[in-house]
């Protein structure tokens, strides 16, 4: 496909030169508009001839052809420039209007472009409505036409929900998590006890658990001690009886 020339669709572009904005006024706006990089400016116009011959803009009235004039000015924000075809000192045909807002140049749409855009927007909306209505329309030779909306609702329910992709964490989030972990480590530092030389340090809680005897072992030791006492008592025998003195 051939590349589309930018001049074929001037309604969709704008142009600005920031160096001119501070000095833009009614006297310099036409010079600003005649910049070489401005796509809206026609090099074959009478303004270019007057500029090369260093004449005043009043000489445009005595010439025939395309020219640019300042139609309206509302300094320093708004300027309107008209492109027109001059046929005689008293007869001109407007060709296009351009408006400058805050230094940015736009081409004003003509009536045909406005009507075309509005009609296309309206037709697109009507066509979308008809397409949506036809998707619910059903026909059978014995029943005729009817509307059926349940299939569409069931299809929406059956459609699996797209899984949300896990977004990678940002640098700020990673730094924030590291700062919180360091803060927790400072508030609750781990404690270690060196049990034997050459071994790895063991946490204090674990060392306490190893040092404390289990309750079952304590009970078994108590039972063994009671048994030993009973055995010693049984081996000694009953105590001897002594005679009472009358």
Swiss-Prot record:
GO terms for cellular component: core mediator complex; mediator complex; nucleoplasm; nucleus; ubiquitin ligase complex. There is a cross-link at residue 208 (Glycyl lysine isopeptide (Lys-Gly) (interchain with G-Cter in SUMO2)). It is found in: Nucleus. GO terms for molecular function: DNA binding; transcription coactivator activity; transcription coactivator binding; ubiquitin protein ligase activity. Residues 206-226 have a biased composition (Basic and acidic residues). The keyword Secreted does not apply. The keyword Nucleus applies. Residues 191-246 are annotated as: Disordered. The modification N6-acetyllysine is found at residues 236, 241. Keywords: Acetylation, Activator, Isopeptide bond, Nucleus, Transcription, Transcription regulation, Ubl conjugation. It comes from the Eukaryota. One of its GO terms (biological process) is positive regulation of transcription by RNA polymerase II. Belongs to the Mediator complex subunit 6 family. Component of the Mediator complex, a coactivator involved in the regulated transcription of nearly all RNA polymerase II-dependent genes. Mediator functions as a bridge to convey information from gene-specific regulatory proteins to the basal RNA polymerase II transcription machinery. Mediator is recruited to promoters by direct interactions with regulatory proteins and serves as a scaffold for the assembly of a functional preinitiation complex with RNA polymerase II and the general transcription factors. Component of the Mediator complex, which is composed of MED1, MED4, MED6, MED7, MED8, MED9, MED10, MED11, MED12, MED13, MED13L, MED14, MED15, MED16, MED17, MED18, MED19, MED20, MED21, MED22, MED23, MED24, MED25, MED26, MED27, MED29, MED30, MED31, CCNC, CDK8 and CDC2L6/CDK11. The MED12, MED13, CCNC and CDK8 subunits form a distinct module termed the CDK8 module. Mediator containing the CDK8 module is less active than Mediator lacking this module in supporting transcriptional activation. This is Mediator of RNA polymerase II transcription subunit 6. It comes from Mus musculus (Mouse).
């Amino acid at each position: 496909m051939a590349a589309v020339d930018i001049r074929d669709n001037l309604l969709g572009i704008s142009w600005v030169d920031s160096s001119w904005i501070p000095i833009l006024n009614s006297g310099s706006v036409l010079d600003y508009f005649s910049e070489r990089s401005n796509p809206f400016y026609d090099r074959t116009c009478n303004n270019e001839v007057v500029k090369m011959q260093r004449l005043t803009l009043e000489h445009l009235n005595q010439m025939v052809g395309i020219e640019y004039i300042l139609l309206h000015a509302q300094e320093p924000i708004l300027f309107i420039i008209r492109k027109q075809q001059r046929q005689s000192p008293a007869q001109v045909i407007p060709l296009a209007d351009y408006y400058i807002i805050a230094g940015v140049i736009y081409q004003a749409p003509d009536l045909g472009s406005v009507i075309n855009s509005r009609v296309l927007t309206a037709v697109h909306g009507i066509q979308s409505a008809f397409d949506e209505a036809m998707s619910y329309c059903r026909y059978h030779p014995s029943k005729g036409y009817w509307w059926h909306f349940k299939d569409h609702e069931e299809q929406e329910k059956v459609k699996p929900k797209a899984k949300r992709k896990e977004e990678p964490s940002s640098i700020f989030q990673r730094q924030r998590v590291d700062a919180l972990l360091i803060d927790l480590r400072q508030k609750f530092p781990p404690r270690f006890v060196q049990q034997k030389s050459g071994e790895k340090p063991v946490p204090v809680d674990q060392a306490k658990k190893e040092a404390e005897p289990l309750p079952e072992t304590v009970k078994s030791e108590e039972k063994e001690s009671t048994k030993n006492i009973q055995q010693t008592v049984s081996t000694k025998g009953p105590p001897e009886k002594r005679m009472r003195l009358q």
